[in-house]
């Protein structure tokens, strides 16, 4: 029964395609010129909108792709980040993203946001004792207003970045003493018991450093989870006294702790719909036929059942081959050549396909806060959809039904449109209004496939 049904469906589609199109549905030359002029005016209006995106008043017809990037960045940053911190984040961007701005597929991290904060206040607290291996303590205050409620902390580090590599003649073992304090409250607030958390981290200085990271996830995780916006901490280093006898080792640590202000680096997972969620791409759904035993080369069936399954599959393949050979037989005489006639319907000249739309953020006057990528190609879908949409577009049967309704029953029902079907994410490195730096991965920012719907 399957073969006659397929033949009947094919015959109906064949008859529909052969049916001549009414003259009323063909646009006149004057109408075509009007349509072309309207398209040009629409394109000019789009460019006009793009050219005014940098203004203070955001247009209401802003493309959703660009609105994600523009949101909250109507003006240039009030503060500029430290040059050393910016170089570090640029290096991080190159490690995480391609030149086109898409996240690298070989990265296996589960976070999609990295934020770097420089201290908004810093002052020396205690002089220290270099002879005993204790270096001066430094008070730091970080403002985390840019961290949203949908961003969950994965990891946090104190980052020391240097203009020049710091060298040590031999490895030096040290302990970082971190004291996190409750921010001071005004006299109007109710008094509360002072909060203080002490955290020690052991590490080792080696020969050359351009930057150094100290993991502070344990003390900061409850504060970020409770949406604390001001983090007040005191940092000092204590190193083995016998290892600081060499003057170069002592001078390197002294310059690092006093002359270089550390930054706070937060690795976060943005759970909003706009963010790219790498978890789905790292854990695809396993097919039912692929069991753990099959991956190791073992069969999931006993010998008898496996043989029976092989016989059934081979018989099924023969049935499919015979059915396909019947369908491949021509339904019309070979002398009638309709290939040129069908070509205008099945393969239109302006076929639905991807087109490039390359722009630079300097055109939009966004280059003062978007650090990378410098250029963006969101791509778009444009073209005519064929009357009989094939498997190449992945369109549902409803698309063909809509075409039939438009041509045979009601012309007010629109034809299927050429629209994006798949997207890829985009990695963006941006300077926030408060001077912090953010690396973010946004979902559905670059069209990669078109379809007719």
From Swiss-Prot:
GO MF annotations in UniProt: cytokine activity; growth factor activity
Localized where? Secreted
Give the propeptide positions.
28-318
Q: Name one GO biological process term.
A: oocyte growth
Instruction: State the oligomer form and interacting partners.
Output: Homodimer or heterodimer (Potential). But, in contrast to other members of this family, cannot be disulfide-linked.
Q: What else is known?
A: Ovarian physiology and fertility are controlled by endocrine and paracrine signals. These act in a species-dependent manner and determine the ovulation quota in different mammalian species. While humans, and mammals such as the cow or red deer, normally ovulate only one egg per cycle, other mammals such as mouse and pig can ovulate in excess of ten per cycle. The mechanisms that regulate the species-specific differences in the number of follicles that go onto ovulate during each reproductive cycle are poorly understood.
Task: Give the protein's recorded name.
Answer: Growth/differentiation factor 9
